[in-house]
Amino acid sequence: MDMITVGQSVKIKRTDGRVHMAVVAVINQSGKCITVEWYERGETKGKEVELDAILTLNPELMQDTVEQHAAPEPKKQATAPMNLSRNPTQSAIGGNLTSRMTMAGNMLNKIQESQSIPNPIVSSNSVNTNSNSNTTAGGGGGTTTSTTTGLQRPRYSQAATGQQQTRIASAVPNNTLPNPSAAASAGPAAQGVATAATTQGAGGASTRRSHALKEVERLKENREKRRARQAEMKEEKVALMNQDPGNPNWETAQMIREYQSTLEFVPLLDGQAVDDHQITVCVRKRPISRKEVNRKEIDVISVPRKDMLIVHEPRSKVDLTKFLENHKFRFDYAFNDTCDNAMVYKYTAKPLVKTIFEGGMATCFAYGQTGSGKTHTMGGEFNGKVQDCKNGIYAMAAKDVFVTLNMPRYRAMNLVVSASFFEIYSGKVFDLLSDKQKLRVLEDGKQQVQVVGLTEKVVDGVEEVLKLIQHGNAARTSGQTSANSNSSRSHAVFQIVLRPQGSTKIHGKFSFIDLAGNERGVDTSSADRQTRMEGAEINKSLLALKECIRALGKQSAHLPFRVSKLTQVLRDSFIGEKSKTCMIAMISPGLSSCEHTLNTLRYADRVKELVVKDIVEVCPGGDTEPIEITDDEEEEELNMVHPHSHQLHPNSHAPASQSNNQRAPASHHSGAVIHNNNNNNNKNGNAGNMDLAMLSSLSEHEMSDELIVQHQAIDDLQQTEEMVVEYHRTVNATLETFLAESKALYNLTNYVDYDQDSYCKRGESMFSQLLDIAIQCRDMMAEYRAKLAKEEMLSCSFNSPNGKR
């Protein structure tokens, strides 16, 4: 560090390769580095440079240091011999050479120590210079004897190169006196030492680089690796995109293919055994439709085993990285997109045919999103808008019913087969075999639910059943949606009933239900009241259906069947040990239907999971523990059921032979019947509200408070509508009777001697009754209109949740 001082100007090299002058600001002795500063573009800049780099760019510092440390010896004049008089400065040159070589060796040792070079191995050869000659100066007699100087020349095994050793050795003669050749080489010797030091500095700079330079090289290396990796990823991306050209979901498709490559596919085969369950839950995946192919949809459903299904839901992380969330579901059966209707029927509805011949109630219903294939599975395949009913579950079950009926075991029972077909839309029941006539659902004195006015036709063969199915499907309420051009908007119920010949008692009944699309329940917050009521009814019916199936599995004492018309009609199918139910969950394989598919599968999974866990509760002693019902609960059950058994059918038609005095009480009796019906409807509504409260408590995680309030408002609206319509029907019948009485009273005035007092008295009584009926009808309609406005305001006050089921 002695050759450099603070304030000295030295050359430095920038990271971009530029070389310029800078001023030494700080010298770090321990770190062997120097801090330099320079002025550039109006500001002072600085950096830390290692000593090796400074010496490499400034070799003159080494030469200056060697010259400064080489102190000249005083010249002693002596008389030289005659033979040396031609070269009077030879002795001085030799002395200077020795001093310079000594200082050069010391300087080289310092440089090597600064570069952490191991200690040198000193050779055994010593350079001894014996000067015994007398030097004569200017003819004087005085002589000078030079002293003996021993110079040890270090030898480095690895640090010094051969060229450097040669230069140093050539600069110092071995055991000889200085001669003209040595004197001639004295000057270049010091220059050779400086050159060696410069070479060593360059080597140290190559091994010890500055931190900034190392960081730049590291960043450059990382950048090159990153670019190479990006190029590889781009090539892989192009290769994957070539597998699905033009598909925006190619990345998701590739992840699904990679996951499927780890699965072992063992699908359901036609020859496998059929299991017997009281409640069978299965799922069917339909093929991708032509519309989905045109939209570049991808298949996100995998069916690896006969009882397992996986939904590959694409998700995104916070950094927008895509990944798959694989949802696994397990059911009794899982049908892939290669299974046809015959195979689905074999494992679902066919085992239930035997149940109805043994005196049981069987139910098979299809559940799923609009366009998932429910009507295709239950009714038959579609060719455009024309449905082929021969390969649906309806027709195949009817065929097996007649085959079983002709077996010797059941032929002696003399059973009669009849069929009915109706639909449930927005809480109303319509007969599909009688021009969609509106029907009423009531309970008789034996607490049996009856569909009043339902058309039930006796059938003798499969062809007659097919005609009924075609007629009913043509009349069913449907509409066009984005998923399906012929979307079902109602629950269709097709029933095959077995009765003994000459009896009205039901021996067995098979109910096939094609449910409305489950995504319709999301429309409970729609701006259209009809759509809201339709969605609310679908929500209630599906939740009630699930709870009724749970009650069937647990053998529960109470069914919340009054919540919806669907469960009211199917009440007898959920009671008794001989009742069996089969659920077919229909799903769409497309990516756009992933959310609805998961809702459908979760609904079906809860049904089966609850049945497996909650069939019976075993006591420690091994006996089954029945569900206890208190006296208050039994009384509550009776209070909810008995009002329906005493409901009267209004009939205000009086015989034509009755006198005018007897007809007036008949009209008054009509009003009494109306009031009685209203009271019964109120009791029915109270029971329905209790069932709805029970349903909401059982499905607290699926129904929010806002949704429950909206359901209650819509229920109240539907009950009020039924009361108003029923009262209006009775008023029409009363008006027909009143018109006949009014004409008869008017005809009395054609006689000259008619009784004016009797005429006025009877007319006053008749019109008073008519006024009471009109006022009551007006008040009921005003109340109904107020409830409509209330429901409208309620639907606008909050947003309904996403239709959980």
UniProtKB/Swiss-Prot annotation:
ATP binds at residues 368-375. Residues 80-94, 158-179, 648-664 have a biased composition (Polar residues). Residues 205-244 form a coiled coil. Residues 123-136, 180-200, 676-688 have a biased composition (Low complexity). Expressed in male germline stem cells and spermatogonia (at protein level). Keywords: ATP-binding, Cell cycle, Cell division, Centromere, Chromosome, Chromosome partition, Coiled coil, Cytoplasm, Cytoskeleton, Microtubule, Mitosis, Motor protein, Nucleotide-binding, Phosphoprotein. Belongs to the TRAFAC class myosin-kinesin ATPase superfamily. Kinesin family. MCAK/KIF2 subfamily. This is Kinesin-like protein Klp10A. It comes from Drosophila melanogaster (Fruit fly). The lineage of its organism: Eukaryota, Metazoa, Ecdysozoa, Arthropoda, Hexapoda. The gene is Klp10A.
